[in-house]
Amino acid sequence: MIKGLYALPPDVGAYLARIGLAPEDFRRAMHLELPPSPTDYSIPHTKESLDLLVHAHLFHVPFENIDGYDLHREVSLEIPDIFDKIVTRRRGGYCFELNALFSALLEALGFSCYAVGQRVLREGSFPPVSHRVTVVTLP
């Protein structure tokens, strides 16, 4: 079980296609030469690359928390399960799902990143940690 929480996406190409960035489209958008093979996902680890990935993910994968209201469905935070939900079945997810899968994509692409818990602050309150965000360190 724990291993599934830190797995890489089963199919990086399918994930990139889900967010509208087939590998060749991504490389063209970044003005890079096309790779020698269709499974070469090497990209520069720059702010521009990261911005393109973040924008594509936000534009193509909606925030949704529908599964949390289904008493007969268990929400899994394992990467293969999240991948199936978001990439294969083309659904959205909530912050823990979206950020876990996006972090896994970034790691698969060679970015240095880690997860942290966050609070949603409202004036006059100090609530518990209830959200997951991804911190990316660029060279």
Regions found by a protein language model. Give the residues of each.
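Glycine-aromatic micro-motifs
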Residues: 2-3
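Hydrophobic/aromatic-rich core segments of domains that either
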Residues: 100-139
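Secondary-structure boundary elements
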Residues: 6-90
